[in-house]
Regions:
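Intrinsic low-complexity/disordered segments
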Residues: 1-2, 13
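Intrinsic disorder/low-complexity segments
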Residues: 15, 30-33
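Aromatic (phenylalanine/tyrosine) cluster motif
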Residues: 3-5, 28
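Carbohydrate-active catalytic/glycan-binding domains of CAZyme proteins
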Residues: 32-514
Length: 514
């Protein structure tokens, strides 16, 4: 058994005083070096707006690859590519089938292959691999170990370890595709959170263990991923060996929300990443104050690796303003291709799905109808990430099918507008109503508007003259702290009943949210 190194209270106080002095110097240096005259311009957070939780990142030369928890959305584990750490493009997805709720992946690269270790809630931990981040990806391999949030670390002698939640680790087989029975052990107790901080508890999760220079670093998520605004954080410890003992940083936490007045709440679950010239950043997730139902968004923040061998934060709230771009910026509008209906890259189903239901040709999505309501029809969804937006689509439905637009949290909580054999309808849990009008209409345009949490619906018979429907709803409560499940409120399309529905001329617009 390996135990964490603990200092006494006096040593802790000395380290904290020393850390405070060092931090003042670092902040002064950062202020001088982080002006808006960066040769690459500036960026603002989030770098991925909307529900992109538990980011894990790896660098291959000048290319960066990142993935996130996919939870109950499928296809799962979308892999993103960037060359500037700010603009990201989806390039593949690692999971072809629904395994369950997929949590906290860890993407890594070794021996010319890419690996993603991940948790399936209630089933354990798995791994997939590929020769290229563009895929194709292997079938999932069961690692035969419980816990959550796996992360691989390869020791100097080639021994492979899988670090897990609760400060535990287990040895992996030589190929990294299974675990060695009887080797599970607890190696780290976590950074002790101050008693007066308001969190969800210790919740020692999201380990990222890697060697940088002479040190091994244990980056951990603590405090709980949701709950109060000040819950989450990133703590860090180090050791001369992957076997420990682990010494907590005097600068902890590296990332944290200190006030409910901050823009970004529950900041945590971070991964360190460097640039080719040796500058360091951390990617992590956070809820946005006032827009909790957007989910946990991906943020990027510079950090400093000091001469003392510790990673230092450069300020408590630098993430809220403009920051110098790490690298030459390359623009990419991830919503510009929504009209192509790229399922798996831009669009995803909720839970299980039958891929044969969907076909795309010349910008028209043909979707076979299924289920009795949005609850069991596996709606096709996308991430918006904006405070105010609207989306619309032209619909041609078979007389036996219903079709519509939704804002979807899960199979119990959703809102939307549709049309079917009985006329126009409002989707809302089991309380949706049929308007008993336009029963014979099979060709229609529908629009949903989400203007800073207030949702309204519109329809048109010619795509030019629009009519507002007679309902509206406020949706800020559609979030994890109310409904659980770690989901977000996603816009999308649904086809219900029997027959087919054709969706075409899809349009998405960001509205002025000021």
């Amino acid at each position: 058994m390996i135990f964490q190194y603990r200092t006494n209270n006096l040593n802790i106080m000395k380290r904290q005083i020393s850390a405070a002095i060092g931090l003042v110097c670092l902040l002064f240096a950062a202020a001088c070096s982080s002006d808006s005259n960066s040769p690459y311009g500036t960026y603002v957070n989030p770098v991925l707006a909307g529900d992109y939780p538990d980011p894990s990142i790896v660098r291959d030369g000048e290319d960066y690859y990142m993935t996130h928890s996919s939870f109950d959305y499928n296809p799962g584990l979308v892999v993103w590519h960037s060359r500037d750490l700010v603009n990201w493009e989806p390039i593949s997805y690692a999971l072809q089938e629904y395994l369950g709720s997929v949590w906290a992946p860890d993407i890594s690269m070794r021996d010319g292959k890419f690996y993603i270790y991940f948790t399936v809630h209630g089933r354990g931990n798995f791994v997939v691999y590929a020769d290229s981040p563009y895929g194709p990806w292997s079938e999932p391999h069961d690692l035969h170990v419980g816990q959550i949030d796996p992360c691989i670390a390869v020791a100097e002698d080639g021994t492979k370890w899988l670090f897990l939640s609760g400060g535990q680790r287990i040895r992996l087989t030589e190929d990294g595709l299974d675990t060695v029975p009887g080797t599970l052990e607890k190696v780290y107790a976590g950074w002790p959170i101050p008693e007066d901080w308001i969190t969800e508890g210790l919740a020692l999760e999201g380990p990222k263990v890697r060697k940088i220079g002479p040190w091994w670093y244990f980056i951990a998520a603590e405090g709980g991923t949701a709950g109060p605004p000040t819950s989450h954080m990133v703590a860090i410890a180090r050791s001369k060996s992957v076997d420990g003992p682990w010494e907590d940083s005097p600068y902890n936490p590296l990332v944290h929300t200190y006030s409910r007045d901050d823009r970004w709440w529950s900041r945590g679950h971070g991964s360190l990443i460097d640039t080719p010239d040796g500058r360091w950043y951390i990617v992590y997730h956070s809820y946005e104050n006032g827009y909790y139902n957007l989910g946990r968004q991906t943020l990027l923040e510079p950090v400093e690796l000091g001469e003392d061998g510790w990673f230092h934060p450069l300020g408590k709230n630098i993430v809220e303003g403009e920051l110098p771009a790490p690298l030459p910026l390359q623009s990419y509008d991830r919503k510009s291709r929504l009209g192509e209906f790229r399922i798996g890259l831009d669009w995803k189903y909720y839970k299980d799905f039958d891929a044969s239901r969907a076909s795309v040709q010349n910008g028209t999505l043909t979707l076979k109808a299924a289920g009795q309501s949005p609850a069991d029809a596996a709606p096709l969804l996308f991430v918006a990430g904006d405070h105010a937006y609207e989306f619309e689509v032209e619909i041609d439905r078979d007389p036996t099918a219903s079709a519509g637009l939704v804002l979807y949290y899960n199979s119990t909580y959703y809102i939307g507008e549709g049309i079917g054999p009985r006329g126009t309808m409002r989707f809302r849990r089991d309380k949706g109503g049929v308007r008993q009008r336009m029963q014979d209409v099979t060709h229609i345009w529908l629009r949903l508007r989400n203007d800073r949490q207030v949702v309204s619906a519109y329809y048109s018979l010619d795509g030019k003259e629009w009519h507002k429907d007679d309902w509206g709803i406020e949706v800020s409560g559609y979030n994890h702290n109310v409904f659980h499940e770690f989901q977000s409120l996603l816009p999308g399309l649904v086809a219900i009943g029997e027959g087919e529905v054709k969706f075409s001329n899809f349009k998405y617009r960001t509205l002025d949210s000021e």
